[in-house]
Amino acid sequence: MVEDILAPGLRVVFCGINPGLSSAGTGFPFAHPANRFWKVIYQAGFTDRQLKPQEAQHLLDYRCGVTKLVDRPTVQANEVSKQELHAGGRKLIEKIEDYQPQALAILGKQAYEQGFSQRGAQWGKQTLTIGSTQIWVLPNPSGLSRVSLEKLVEAYRELDQALVVRGR
């Protein structure tokens, strides 16, 4: 089981779709060697060094957290049903209301659209909020994603810089 890493007062909570088998096996988020999450958040400015999956709890030192829409591990995210994503979206709203981070970053357009019953999402900041928490949709850093490392870092850096501008 991959546990959430959450606390009150975070700058951002990154929300993956669901754990892959590597993460489920180790208990650490974004654990597959091909997953670029740790490299991307470092290069985008969220951390001052590249953390390893087993150091995930140190995200809290940087006022960052991690959660997921669906707890069930799969080989690929497309094995998760629309119903699971929708139910996960409802649970996620409750978590975000409890912890009230400055931003929630959903990693993937389809995850956002299905989890929050939205259509036509664009990358970046969304008009929908959860209380005062901004919602951002960022490309998924999975090794299966065709988005380049450069584009991932650019998208995540936009969120980091927006939070800096807000004084967070």
Curated annotation (Swiss-Prot):
Inducing stimuli: Induced in stationary phase.
Major localisation: cytoplasm
Gene3D superfamilies, per the entry: Uracil-DNA glycosylase-like domain
Keywords: Cytoplasm, DNA damage, DNA excision, DNA repair, DNA-binding, Hydrolase
One GO term of the biological process aspect: base-excision repair, AP site formation
Subunit structure: Binds DNA as a monomer.
Protein name: G/U mismatch-specific DNA glycosylase
